[in-house]
Amino acid sequence: MPKYYCDYCDTFLTHDSPSVRKTHNGGRKHKDNVRMFYQKWMEDQAQKLVDQTARAFATNRMQGAVPRTTMGMAPVPPVGHHPMMGGPPGMPMMAPRPFPGPGVGFPGAPGMPPFPGGPMGMAGPPGMPPMMPRPPQQFRPM
């Protein structure tokens, strides 16, 4: 009669019948062995991941490679100058608005058409913060 071998417990059962296997698989020692097996397997997988990461990091460091996160990205502006805040470097910065107000293409109240753009000249010249009036323009009669 064939015997059943339990890999977790490293033992042969008396014989290969469903009732014997069911009794064995429900036992405390078998459950502990299964739990230890998978816990060890998870620890091994975690260690492999740590080793791979350390190896990849060391390889990049030794070759002097630039980290992939900086490739193709815009250069970082100098500290203290935030171009989104407007104004040249060294000028006091304006605080950002907490919520974007209605602007071109933003809908108004439900069922209302979108708000038109602000008055002419309120966008400001390039490089200047918004809401700064443009310098007066000369109009020629036609």
Curated annotation (Swiss-Prot):
Residue spans, zinc finger Matrin-type? 4-36
What's a GO biological-process term for it? spliceosomal snRNP assembly
Q: Which InterPro entries match?
A: Matrin/U1-C_Znf_C2H2 (IPR000690), Matrin/U1-like-C_Znf_C2H2 (IPR003604), U1-CZ_Znf_C2H2 (IPR013085), U1_snRNP-C (IPR017340), Znf_C2H2_sf (IPR036236)
| Cell compartments where the protein resides | Nucleus
The primary site where this protein sits is nucleus
Q: Which SUPFAM superfamilies match?
A: beta-beta-alpha zinc fingers (SSF57667)
Sequence intervals crossing the membrane: none
Record keywords, A-Z:
Metal-binding, Nucleus, Ribonucleoprotein, RNA-binding, Zinc, Zinc-finger
Q: Where is the signal peptide?
A: none
- Database matches in Pfam families: zf-U1
Tell me which GO cellular component terms the UniProt record holds.
commitment complex; U1 snRNP; U2-type prespliceosome
General function of this protein: Component of the spliceosomal U1 snRNP, which is essential for recognition of the pre-mRNA 5' splice-site and the subsequent assembly of the spliceosome. U1-C is directly involved in initial 5' splice-site recognition for both constitutive and regulated alternative splicing. The interaction with the 5' splice-site seems to precede base-pairing between the pre-mRNA and the U1 snRNA. Stimulates commitment or early (E) complex formation by stabilizing the base pairing of the 5' end of the U1 snRNA and the 5' splice-site region.
HAMAP family to which the protein is assigned, alphabetical: U1_C
What PANTHER family does the database record attribute to this sequence?
U1 SMALL NUCLEAR RIBONUCLEOPROTEIN C (PTHR31148:SF1)
Q: Report quaternary structure and partners.
A: U1 snRNP is composed of the 7 core Sm proteins B/B', D1, D2, D3, E, F and G that assemble in a heptameric protein ring on the Sm site of the small nuclear RNA to form the core snRNP, and at least 3 U1 snRNP-specific proteins U1-70K, U1-A and U1-C. U1-C interacts with U1 snRNA and the 5' splice-site region of the pre-mRNA.
What family is this? Belongs to the U1 small nuclear ribonucleoprotein C family.
Protein name from the UniProt record: U1 small nuclear ribonucleoprotein C
- Classification lineage: Eukaryota, Metazoa, Ecdysozoa, Nematoda, Chromadorea
Identify the gene encoding this protein: snrp-3
